[in-house]
């Protein structure tokens, strides 16, 4: 696929005028990476929203990188654009999942549908957050708590070591 990798740079970013050219003169997907420039991340997200092009944005973690290993990098990307760039939390989540699935159409993940792999993450607002849901947590800048991670329909983790506990943990019945 055609992807503008690191639209927000790595240790340094391209000028905003070049970002504008890429956004205006191509229809390529645009990858925002966790270890990139936060100001350019905000600019790209806001401009894509103004242009009705949020479907072009995907997220990358870019770890390990020269910045190091960034645990929860994709969740941090979602939080940044939802809390800083005025993107609704549920849309930011879809940018990380469904948009990536559409760009890399050979993947059978990223979209919940019959025939797709059952790779799911159950999350909620973290304890202590002002948010009441995972989406609200993204929008106020809090990383949600993860309570179950399922791969191919099988629970692989029932508690996260890297996120705060959930206000309401998922239960298997």
Language model features with spans:
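A short, hydrophobic/aromatic-rich structural module that often spans a beta strand
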Residues: 110-113, 168-173
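Short secondary-structure boundary/hinge segments and terminal tails
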Residues: 14, 41, 99-100, 133, ...
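C-terminal cap of metal-dependent C-N hydrolases
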Residues: 118-171
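His/Asp/Glu-enriched, well-ordered alpha-helical/loop segment
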Residues: 43-125
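Short acidic-hydrophobic sequence patches enriched in Asp/Glu that either
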Residues: 14, 73, 141
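Solvent-exposed alpha-helices and their adjacent loops that cap or buttress functional pockets
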Residues: 22-25, 51, 95, 113-114, ...
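Active-site core of metal-dependent hydrolases
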Residues: 1-68
């Amino acid at each position: 696929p055609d992807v503008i990798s690191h639209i927000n740079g790595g240790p340094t970013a391209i000028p905003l005028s070049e970002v504008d050219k890429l956004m205006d003169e191509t229809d390529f997907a645009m990858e925002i990476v966790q270890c990139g420039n936060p100001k350019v991340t905000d600019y790209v997200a806001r401009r894509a929203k103004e242009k009705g092009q949020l479907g072009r944005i995907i997220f990358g973690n870019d770890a390990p990188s020269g910045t190091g290993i960034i645990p929860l990098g994709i969740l941090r990307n979602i939080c940044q654009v939802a809390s800083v760039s005025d993107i609704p939390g549920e849309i930011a989540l879809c940018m990380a999942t469904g948009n990536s699935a559409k760009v890399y159409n050979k993947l059978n993940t990223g979209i919940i549908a019959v025939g797709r792999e059952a790779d799911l993450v159950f999350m909620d607002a973290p304890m202590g957050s002002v948010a009441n849901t995972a989406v609200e947590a993204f929008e106020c800048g809090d990383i949600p708590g993860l309570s179950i991670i399922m791969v191919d329909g099988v629970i692989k983790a029932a508690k996260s070591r890297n996120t705060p506990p959930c206000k309401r943990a998922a239960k298997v019945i």
